């Protein structure tokens, strides 16, 4: 955009500030701890219940002082409008904090300026106290589909000399300034709080509460509301006034919503950068100024997405030196202009936005240059595509499991999981999922900051997960005899035979073989061989021929879970002494006792256990150790924390195998034991280890081995950031 038009847009905001009393220093309202953020996009619209599951699983990343959800790309029929209105009109969502404020807000800020095609109050629960996870009554929310009246927009353009500005861009700016006025009158940060704008943009919605994010789904009854992208935030403010929902994330810009995990060290500097451009923060949070920065560079400066990211997370040092020369010159200019407005400190953004001029929806994640906050990306390719971003992998796992229950074309195991490298010359510390129409269907492509596509495994043959033909599938006699032969040997023999055969087998062959192994595993030897072979199939890399590796892994994990669940419970008295394995779950936890006869392995089904506390699976494992158990298998994990903690010193004879989606702080403080993680691990892994052995057949998250004093550590995947401090 030409510099004189940029100046005019900035100057047009001056009158907004005429009656604003500026404090000498604009300070944040609250400090924030380690929040939880998650987002996903789908090539087909999917229901709000699928953002509920990862939000609930990240419940302990919030403290009930703020939760929020945003969505982009709706189904017009669900909103009671036409496709034309949905795509062309702004969706204006206003939170009403007092019962009698609606008429006044409409009279002063809506009907004088906008043509309203439709409006409606959002449905809500009859009694907010019946919805778990709410701390105060959420606001009533009214949704308006609006366009600026022609005569109003003409006057706005003339007054601000916007004749050379695209008319739709001028309308965007009017909408933005009108929302500022509404907020200033009805929700001044230090004054009365009656109403505020939740979101303003085309085909986008933001909802937020004082409480937890998952409560929004039930309170506003959006379980079945469908959209192409969803993001959520669990807030963890650590000080300040946090009893109003406006401070919760996401924060809005025109056509965008942003959530944030972290805390700026230079909030005042960033605010000054905005004030110099006549942009005044109203809600006094890091996340608000982040959204304002992004909106400024996107709409006013017309920066490309690459250059917006560079301004917010500048490339530096060796990475800068490795950039192409043409980028260095431009990046130097961007950094010189925006360095004082570049967020400093630990942060990770997830942004969803509508890009109407490209007929595109976007979901993107940006990490700070030092990667000081956890982040993970994933992509599930196929007939239905899913792109995912989260502050922890277990939230991504929860999303895919939820989606797959509704649509079996979606595999619970993604094709690829990866991390961004902040401020790097390789990926720029950001990845973008673009959802746009291709040959009449919505499809997703994923690129890094520089526009380089993310490489995915070569497309393979998908498994029909709902097919049950494998249940009656007749294996040829050679396969059947080999399975019987190798099942009686070491698990390595069995694994090698299956591994070498997978490329030539059909999916039905593979599933029937897995099932046969489980069904024939009756005694300790057979069960151990099956668990060992399945674990290696889950952990190791091997050729799968024309099949999808992610589908093979899902089938293995499904069968392994079936095997674990088939084991006898602790209180099952009908099994003989030939089986060393005993099962316990949440419902049977009161039957915990010490090992009897030849029992030696306690198998804990962690599903449905709380993630932490006295009733957690980690606490159960500790109690079991005190009663004499030394070998453990933990499966069905959905983010449970502290596995292996609290067992005390000299635990050399303790062995723990962990499957599925374990949570933070696993193996922290161990002294001698062996823990094997048969999947990716999470954050705060292995802190203050004294002695022992830790094996991870996947990636590890942030703050890996903080304060560790010893031990043997093996990681097959990568370490996302800040290990070994």
Task: Mark where each language-model region is.
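Conserved short alpha-helical segments that host acidic/polar catalytic motifs at enzyme active sites
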Residues: 1-478
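Long, distal/terminal scaffolding or interaction modules
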Residues: 467-725
């Amino acid at each position: 955009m030409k510099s004189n038009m940029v100046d005019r847009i900035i100057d047009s905001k001056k009158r907004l500030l005429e009656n604003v009393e500026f404090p000498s220093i604009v300070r944040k309202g609250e400090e924030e701890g380690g929040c939880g953020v998650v987002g996903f996009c789908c090539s087909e619209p999917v229901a709000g219940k699928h953002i509920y599951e990862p939000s609930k699983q990240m419940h302990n990343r919030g403290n009930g002082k703020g939760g929020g959800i945003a969505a982009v790309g709706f189904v017009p029929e669900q909103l009671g409008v036409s496709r034309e209105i949905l795509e062309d009109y702004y969706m204006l969502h206003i939170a009403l904090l007092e019962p009698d404020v609606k008429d006044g807000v409409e009279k002063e800020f809506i009907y004088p300026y906008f043509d309203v095609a439709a409006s409606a109050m959002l449905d809500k629960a009859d009694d907010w106290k019946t919805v778990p996870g709410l701390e105060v009554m959420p606001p009533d929310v009214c949704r308006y589909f609006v366009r600026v009246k022609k005569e109003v927009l003409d006057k706005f353009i003339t007054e601000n000399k916007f004749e050379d500005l695209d008319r739709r861009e001028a309308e965007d700016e009017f909408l933005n300034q009108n929302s500022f006025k509404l907020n200033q009158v009805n929700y001044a940060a230090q004054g009365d709080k009656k109403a505020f704008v939740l979101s303003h943009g085309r085909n986008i919605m933001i909802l937020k509460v004082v409480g937890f994010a998952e409560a929004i789904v039930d309170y506003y009854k959006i379980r079945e509301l469908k959209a192409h992208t969803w993001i959520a935030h669990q807030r963890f403010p650590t000080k300040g006034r946090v009893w109003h929902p406006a401070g919760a994330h996401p924060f809005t810009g025109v056509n965008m919503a942003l959530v944030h995990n972290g805390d700026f060290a230079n909030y005042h500097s960033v605010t000054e950068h905005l004030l110099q451009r006549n942009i005044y923060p109203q809600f006094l949070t890091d996340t608000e100024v982040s959204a304002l920065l992004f909106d400024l560079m996107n709409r006013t400066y017309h920066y490309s997405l690459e250059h917006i990211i560079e301004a917010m997370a500048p490339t530096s040092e060796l990475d800068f030196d490795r950039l192409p020369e043409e980028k260095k010159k431009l990046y130097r200019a961007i950094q010189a202009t925006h360095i004082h407005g570049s967020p400093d400190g630990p942060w990770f953004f997830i942004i969803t936005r509508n890009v109407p001029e490209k007929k595109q929806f976007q979901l993107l994640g940006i990490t700070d240059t030092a990667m000081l906050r956890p982040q993970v990306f994933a992509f599930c390719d196929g007939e239905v595509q899913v792109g995912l971003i989260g502050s922890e992998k277990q939230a991504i796992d929860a999303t895919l499991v939820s989606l797959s229950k509704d649509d079996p074309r979606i595999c619970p195991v993604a094709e690829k999981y990866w991390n961004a490298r902040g401020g790097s010359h390789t990926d720029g510390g950001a990845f973008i999922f673009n959802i746009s129409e291709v040959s009449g269907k919505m499809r997703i492509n994923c690129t890094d900051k520089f526009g380089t596509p993310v490489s995915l495994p070569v497309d393979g043959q998908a498994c029909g997960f709902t097919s049950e033909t494998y249940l009656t599938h007749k294996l040829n006699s050679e396969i059947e005899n080999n399975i019987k032969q190798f099942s009686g040997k070491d698990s390595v023999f069995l694994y090698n035979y299956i591994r070498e055969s997978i490329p030539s087998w059909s999916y039905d062959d593979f599933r029937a073989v897995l099932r046969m192994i489980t069904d024939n595993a009756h005694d300790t030897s057979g069960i151990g061989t099956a668990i060992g072979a399945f674990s290696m199939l889950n952990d190791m890399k091997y050729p799968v021929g024309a099949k999808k590796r992610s589908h093979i892994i899902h089938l293995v994990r499904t069968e392994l879970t079936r095997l674990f669940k088939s084991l006898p419970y602790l209180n099952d008295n009908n099994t003989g002494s030939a089986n060393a394995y005993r099962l316990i779950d949440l419902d049977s936890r009161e039957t915990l006792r010490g090992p009897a006869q030849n029992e030696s392995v306690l198998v804990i089904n962690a599903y449905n256990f709380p993630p932490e506390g006295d009733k957690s699976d980690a606490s159960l494992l500790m109690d079991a150790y005190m009663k004499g158990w030394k070998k453990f298998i933990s499966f069905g994990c959905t983010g449970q924390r502290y596995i292996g903690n609290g067992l005390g010193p000299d635990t050399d004879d303790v062995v723990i195998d962990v499957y599925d989606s374990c949570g933070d702080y696993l193996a922290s403080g161990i002294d001698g034991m062996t823990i094997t993680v048969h999947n990716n691990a999470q954050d705060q892994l292995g802190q203050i280890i004294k002695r022992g052995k830790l094996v991870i057949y996947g990636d590890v998250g942030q703050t890996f081995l903080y304060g560790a004093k010893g031990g043997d550590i093996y990681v097959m995947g990568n370490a996302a950031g800040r290990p070994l401090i």
